Amino acid sequence: MPQPTRTDPALIRNFCIIAHIDHGKSTLADRMLQLTGVVEERQMRAQYLDRMDIERERGITIKSQAVRLPFTALDDVTYILNLIDTPGHVDFSYEVSRSLAACEGAILLVDAAQGIEAQTLANLYMALEHDLTIIPVLNKIDLPAAQPEKYAAELAGIIGCEPSDVLRVSAKTGEGVEELLNEIVARIPPPVGNADGPARALIFDSVYDTYRGVVTYVRVVDGQITNRERIQMMSTGATHEMLEVGVISPEPTKVDSLGVGEVGYLITGVKDVRQSRVGDTITSAAAPAAEVLPGYRDPKPMVFSGLYPIDGTDYPVLRDALEKLQLNDAALVFEPETSAALGFGFRCGFLGLLHLEITRDRLEREFDLALISTAPNVVYRVRMEDGTEHTVTNPSEFPSGKIAEIREPVVKATVLTPSDYVGPIMELCQGRRGVLDGMEYLSEDRVEMRYTLPLAEIVFDFFDQLKSRTKGYASLDYEPSGEQAADLVKVDILLQGQVVDAFSAIVHRDNAYSYGAEMTKKLRELIPRQQFEVPIQAAIGSRVIARENIRALRKDVLAKCYGGDISRKRKLLEKQKEGKKRMKMVGRVEVPQEAFISALSTESSGEGKDGKKK
């Protein structure tokens, strides 16, 4: 078997699998591991490459992995196939683009019973932009509901090949997998690079290991990377000593060096993944390369949410937990904030809703924390009339005074749906201030619709609405596309004239009344009755737009006046009224924790279900 150091690039094939969740990507990877014999039968477990429990449980891949598979093809030559596993979710599209940049080809894996989905389509377009060779494959042909002929024609139409070029496999039974491996060798071009030039390697993932610090996964483009040499990160200029170089097959195996086209891992003893960023170029510190590999960018958070421990004493635990998660997740940002209502917590920035959902899940599961998260927010840019600019990630930072313009982020969304549901989807998108950019029929019963939508309208419960209006058949993909000016206002919720910061929200002027009315009504049901009347108001600035009252609890002061005189009764009632008035002046409304939790969770219920969304 060719050694990693001395493998002829002509024998290497780097490929990834593009697939929607549940279309069988991990199962296909499992079959490949078994067929090439790198995992013994007795060590095999389902979803071998998905390491995190949450990945196995939700059936999604969050971090990329890379496995080296030796495969003897029909011509009796042993080729090295590097399978680079990619995340399939829209929040992680930058990670996907870096994984694709490390490959020369991609397997487009589609469920033969369901057809292609919006995210798969988005990742396919990304693969075509990277000039990858696409091998279309229909999986699950053993299912009784499979319609391979129909979907082969659909795939052929999208990629521009013949329906007969579409391979058919069943990852579950293993049928057609060997033929697929032979096709990979035949169709995907070998990597090209300058073996004698300065070393350049692309980082496509980095993982934090408790014992050894950060493990960085790389694909060598030019030159070679040798153990024990000093390397330099080209985006930051930082240099590190290399402690170990290796390949994964599928357990880490040490080697002396990695040559052109090889995929492997490096360990430098760095303790923080933010120093080894996905998409960065690694070069030798002694003879650095001049050109950076294209496509690197810093991950920017799109959605912000406050995370607060339900038990205030857990604050330091939450801080440590976030720092630990950040070791493995360079896109997560957080800063401490306090809220009069919820106490101490953190304002966290995420790539999208699934990222938020998964981070919250991991905090609760791995660190045993009970958390409240405030409604997700996007980043607004507010320009005042005096020319100053504010960046707002939290409604409480919203400036008061004369505002010239507010700009909000927008996304280009693609919805794939059966053609019967075009009406309800248009209605939903227009209700969310969407603008239709165009629509295309992929086949007679499937439509691709393209919309420009404000990100703020998607982060709430857009996905749930989309699924419920299309009986779960539509799929959504979106990518950021700049910002637009919008007529937005901040709605405050006041309890007895005091603003409760946790419930403030920035909404479009047209939706302000419905948000205010809904929140006041909800709080009226959740806050227990006090000894005095409590007004709940929703206000924009100083203008109240909705109000509900919590009626006072009253003691029956007339119980002991049996027949008695009316003036006696009136005296007692007046006295009670006087007492209530005094109470109202000095009384404070205690909002129970449960009321916060249920008001915030119903308000951001979009998130709760959204994690399972795809």
Curated annotation (Swiss-Prot):
Residues annotated as binding GTP: D22, H23, G24, K25, S26, T27, N139, K140, I141, D142
Primary location: membrane
Catalytic class of the enzyme: hydrolase
Keyword DNA repair among record annotations: no
Membrane association type: Peripheral membrane protein
Chain ranges of the tr-type G domain: 10-192
Keyword field: Cell membrane, GTP-binding, Hydrolase, Membrane, Nucleotide-binding, Protein biosynthesis
SUPFAM superfamilies: EF-G C-terminal domain-like, P-loop containing nucleoside triphosphate hydrolases, Translation proteins
Catalytic activity: GTP + H2O = GDP + phosphate + H(+)
KW Calcium (keyword) present: no
CC per GO annotation: plasma membrane
Function recorded in the entry: Required for accurate and efficient protein synthesis under certain stress conditions. May act as a fidelity factor of the translation reaction, by catalyzing a one-codon backward translocation of tRNAs on improperly translocated ribosomes. Back-translocation proceeds from a post-translocation (POST) complex to a pre-translocation (PRE) complex, thus giving elongation factor G a second chance to translocate the tRNAs correctly. Binds to ribosomes in a GTP-dependent manner.
Family as reported in the entry's similarity comment: Belongs to the TRAFAC class translation factor GTPase superfamily. Classic translation factor GTPase family. LepA subfamily.
Full protein name: Elongation factor 4
Gene name linked to the record: lepA
